Amino acid sequence: MTPIARIAAFASLSIFGVLPVHAQQDPPITIDTHVDIPFSYMHDPKFDAGKDTPLLVDLGKMERGGLNAAFFVVWVPQHKLDAAGYAKAVAQGEQKYDAIGRLLLQYPDRIRLATTPEQLVANHKAGLLSAVIEIENGYSLGHDIHRLDAAFDRGARSIGLAHVGNNDLCTSSLPDTKHGEPAMNSTGDTGMSDFGRAVIKRANQLGMLVDVSHSSDACVREALKLSTAPVYASHSGARAVLDHPRNLPDDLLRAIADKGGVVDAVAYKEFLKHDPGREAAEKKLQNAIAKQRGEKEYDSDKDDYLPAMDAGMAEIQKKYPLATLDDYMDHIQHMVKIAGIDHVGIASDFDGGGGITGWANASETRNVTAALRKRGFSEADIAKLWGGNLLRVWREVGRDAEH
């Protein structure tokens, strides 16, 4: 039995604990729907999430910050659409599943797998954190629909169709135009493939959330037409607030809401605030670090946590301040205005580029709640944003399942 399979069985057990000290002022439950993990997660001692780590999300930071649950991401980068590329993607995905399994097996007294909304809520009531497994980039299925069933059996409950660069499911909001991929919304943007359509159909049957973050506008529109259940965007912003292709336009915010879904606003600096000076300075720093390490290009999985990177980013911050919680609130308020309070949620993209002034890591999660209150959101609204909406959508997706 695999680590994830053992954990899936273990997750149904109940342990009764004490609610956090801050329970009275915290929302009923807080869920961050996008947290990345490095490939060496739970293998390299410095990425042992049960200890104090350089990661933006570890168990201690979640506990101190009042973050009750996180969608931990099985992400793989985009390679070629050939047998070698698919094999590499499948192998890289296995690394992530194994890492999450190690986390859950090593710290069952602190965090449990949640494969249903009910398990997530039960974990919280028992004083435990929850891990939900989320696939980012359906390319890791290796162009084999049966791997979606295998992922479900291992605990995955969300399938992100695309990432950066077009894959075999659909076109991306950030295609690889340098290597000839057509720009989003151009005549060459083909949207969904037959394999992508099959993945959505099977995800509906299994009761998996269909995640359209990173997908092209055309892909999102077709996903909305094809899916028999609500769809969601695990980590996206509002294009009307910042014109970035990774952000969703108002018509798609409305369409996802009309389908009964939810869009989780992402706290990723470049999707919140345009700062060409900072972006150029960061790129220069990355190139310098790659050169120092003898690498052809910067490897965020290895290099993001180097002392030299920390020092360099501190200098950049002095000249080019990060996006702030106020910038983040601007996106949330616009998304609520367009989609409605029942169709917006919260995501950090921590350890995948996320992190802003005021919400720099999971230990600062309560700052988000305070900022929402400052913007005039009621306690009932905050409860919806922090997890109520996501749990509703997840339940609806499960009810529509045929497995």
Name what the model sees in each region:
Residues 142, 153-232, 237-246:
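Divalent metal-binding pocket/active-site signature
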Residues 22-185, 243-403:
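N-terminal hydrophobic targeting/anchoring segments and the immediately downstream early-domain regions
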Residues 8-20:
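Bacterial N-terminal signal peptides
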Residues 1-9:
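Bacterial N-terminal signal peptides that target proteins for export
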Residues 14-16, 116, 218:
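Serine/proline-rich low-complexity intrinsically disordered segments, especially terminal tails, linkers
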